[in-house]
Amino acid sequence: MDQFQTLSLLQMALNTNAIFTVATFFILWVAFRFAGKMREGESTMLGRVLITVFGLMIVWTGLLVGASRNLSFNAAASGLKAIKASGQTLSVQAEAFLTIPQISSATTTVQFSLFGDMPNVIFWLVVTVMLLSVIWMPVSAKKSS
């Protein structure tokens, strides 16, 4: 495979990842809407548990989407490094791609890692805490005027 094919496959993977990311954020918005509506009215334990499970499934999906994005970057970097090692000259853009810090540390053995991208993990951890707080924290008494 040459560098054009490698970068084209990366672009297709990133386009697919972007679609999944938008869908994940939409369904995350739905989960926060469910949690907010549940918080406004009477909530049952079953409702809280179901929304919690729904939210945790969304967080899991978000982690998978982030991990597949990193896998795509690492696979492309590994392919470009193999092309360069075979003696072919890479374009300026491909060389610039390989100088990105997260990319330059990619190994030749590409592995899927759910927790390989710490900013992604921290983001989804914060989202988890926020969602669980909306679901499980007690509602404060409203002040009457």
Model-identified regions with their sequence ranges:
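Transmembrane alpha-helical segments in integral membrane proteins
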Residues: 26-36, 113-145
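Juxtamembrane non-transmembrane "cap" segments at the membrane-aqueous interface
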Residues: 69-101
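Alpha-helical transmembrane segments of integral membrane proteins
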Residues: 13-20, 45-52, 114-125
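C-terminal TM-helix exit segments that contain a strictly Trp-centered aromatic cap at the helix terminus
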Residues: 57-73
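Membrane-interface interhelical loops and short amphipathic "cap" helices
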Residues: 1-14, 73-79, 83, 108
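Cytosolic-side membrane-entry/anchor segment at the start of a transmembrane helix
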Residues: 1-33
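Interfacial segments of alpha-helical transmembrane regions
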Residues: 39-60
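Membrane-proximal, non-transmembrane alpha-helical segments
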Residues: 99-116
